């Protein structure tokens, strides 16, 4: 799993490109995102965990989404970063642990995986 952070446009572009590359390699890709960007992605599974700024909804849905991806044998997961304040900090901590602290800075890397 990789958490992608940065400006929304750069994050979406990076996840879209990385998803295409992984799917061409035969990977089954899942994406965790906000409701507002859900329609921007094409992957095997795209799950919106809530609206931007609604960290409570993200916290409530995150575990179910991760379990769902696991049961579907998703081999590669990309997640948009969430705000790191309040409940959002707990969501980000869980995402970072699941990602093994693998973070991609969309703008700095041109969307290339670190």
Residue spans of the language-model regions?
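A C-terminal functional module that forms or caps the active site or interfaces directly
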Residues: 2-100
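A glycine-rich helix N-cap at a beta->alpha junction
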Residues: 97-114
């Amino acid at each position: 799993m990789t958490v992608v952070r940065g400006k929304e446009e750069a994050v979406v572009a990076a996840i879209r490109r990385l998803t295409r590359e992984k799917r061409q390699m035969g990977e089954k890709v899942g994406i965790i995102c906000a409701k507002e960007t859900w329609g921007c992605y094409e992957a095997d599974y795209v799950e919106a965990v809530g609206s931007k700024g609604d960290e409570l909804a993200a916290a409530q849905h995150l575990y179910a989404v991760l379990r769902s991806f696991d049961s579907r044998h998703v081999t590669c997961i990309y997640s948009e970063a969430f705000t790191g304040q309040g409940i959002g900090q707990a969501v980000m901590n869980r995402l970072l642990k699941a990602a093994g602290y693998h973070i991609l800075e969309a703008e700095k890397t041109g969307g290339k995986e670190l």
